[in-house]
Amino acid sequence: MIGLAVTTTKKIAKWKVDEVAELTEKLKTHKTIIIANIEGFPADKLHEIRKKLRGKADIKVTKNNLFNIALKNAGYDTKLFESYLTGPNAFIFTDTNPFELQLFLSKFKLKRYALPGDKADEEVVVPAGDTGIAAGPMLSVFGKLKIKTKVQDGKIHILQDTTVAKPGDEIPADIVPILQKLGIMPVYVKLNIKIAYDNGVIIPGDKLSINLDDYTNEIRKAHINAFAVATEIAYPEPKVLEFTATKAMRNALALASEIGYITQETAQAVFTKAVMKAYAVASSISGKVDLGVQIQAQPQVSEQAAEKKEEKKEEEKKGPSEEEIGGGLSSLFGG
């Protein structure tokens, strides 16, 4: 008797084939892929994010194994993604810079109802007015939470706005159903991004969030320092050379005045200095030698003039001010 080996081929569902084909196409046509953990994430909030990203990015929620097959089909190194393809994920396809996309998402504060154990993201205030809750056992709950109430027309009315939790506080479990009844959502919802893959580079999700103010200040400081160095070394750029030429002129005039070199610009300073020295010499010997002339008091430089002179020296030491530097920043870097 001859044994026959029967081979059966499992038919792959058409929706899976279509899903992989769609994912493969998206992987080939977008430079940035973001993988986000959506475990416990409300479906309605994901829909809100999808609407906000319309025109910027596409969001797909699919099985990890189908995404992995699509990665292979699109020519990606699947090993780069292995550790992130666990649990329920959403896959975001975009050509927008991932940092810009994260900044865009962070501007929208999506909220959800509180669950027992949640911490408040903002101050939770129960407003005064009709709660719509029938009087009965719930009155003791309000009393426990120190919320002043009265019963009117068989309903519980809150007498005054009452804070039941501050940011960072755990929301009392007893208040959770009341908050839901009143339509109060005190917990923010945001996508937990695992990684972004941008032009061949894996960026961990926690590195995508940047403080824009701090970042701007750092760039400004770097700009100012670069401009100061450029001014010091006389970097040949028009805006830099304006400051460099001014500084060189001041130094040249100071040197010329010091050595007594007379030009139209230095003549007054040279002669003034010579007169001052002559007064000083005459005053020092007038008591010992009869000069045949009366030595008048040496002209005094006013305190205000002296202060201005000191300020000028200080300015020369410091170089251009931050305001002056700020005006030349964009020119220095081609802006």
Swiss-Prot record:
InterPro entries listed in its UniProt record: Ribosomal_protein_uL10 (IPR050323), Ribosomal_uL10 (IPR001790), Ribosomal_uL10-like_insert (IPR040637), Ribosomal_uL10-like_insert_sf (IPR043164), Ribosomal_uL10-like_sf (IPR043141), Ribosomal_uL10_arc (IPR022909)
Keyword RNA-binding applies: yes
GO biological process: cytoplasmic translation; ribosomal large subunit assembly
Any single Gene Ontology cellular-component annotation: cytosolic large ribosomal subunit
Biased composition (Gly residues): 326-335
Taxonomic superkingdom: Archaea
Ranges where the record places region Disordered: 300-335
Keyword Methyltransferase: no
Keywords: Ribonucleoprotein, Ribosomal protein, RNA-binding, rRNA-binding
Record SUPFAM superfamilies: Ribosomal protein L10-like
GO MF assignments: large ribosomal subunit rRNA binding; structural constituent of ribosome
Pfam families found in the cross-reference section: Ribosomal_L10 (PF00466), RL10P_insert (PF17777)
Compositionally skewed regions (Basic and acidic residues) per UniProt: 305-321
Record's function text: Forms part of the ribosomal stalk, playing a central role in the interaction of the ribosome with GTP-bound translation factors.
Other noteworthy facts: Was called L10e in this organism; in this case 'e' is for E.coli-like, not eukaryotic-type protein.
Family named by the database record: Belongs to the universal ribosomal protein uL10 family.
Alphabetized HAMAP family for the sequence: Ribosomal_uL10_arch (MF_00280)
Subunit text: Part of the 50S ribosomal subunit. Forms part of the ribosomal stalk which helps the ribosome interact with GTP-bound translation factors. Forms a heptameric L10(L12)2(L12)2(L12)2 complex, where L10 forms an elongated spine to which the L12 dimers bind in a sequential fashion.
Protein name stated in the entry: Large ribosomal subunit protein uL10
Gene assigned in the entry: rpl10
